[in-house]
C-alpha cells in the first residue's frame, strides 16, 4: 500500500517544498520510494508556478538534498 503525504505551507515556495525534498531524500536513502507518494502545496495562490525560494534551494544543496 502506498502512503500519501502532503506538506503544506502558505506559499509553497519555501517550507513545504523543503520538507518534501528532505523527506524524499530520506526515503531514497532507505530505498522506500515505492511506498510513498509525496507532494507539497500552499494555502495561497501567490506563487503558483514559481520555483522554490533560491535561498532554500541553496541550503538544500549544501546539505546534499
UniProtKB/Swiss-Prot annotation:
InterPro entries: LMW-PTP (IPR052995), Ptyr_pPase (IPR023485), Ptyr_pPase_sf (IPR036196), Tyr_phospatase_low_mol_wt (IPR017867). The keyword Manganese does not apply. SUPFAM superfamilies: Phosphotyrosine protein phosphatases I. Coiled coil: none annotated. GO terms for molecular function: protein tyrosine phosphatase activity. The keyword DNA damage does not apply. The active site is at residues 9, 15. Keywords: Hydrolase. Belongs to the low molecular weight phosphotyrosine protein phosphatase family. This is Uncharacterized protein in rpcF 3'region. It comes from Synechococcus sp. (strain WH8020).
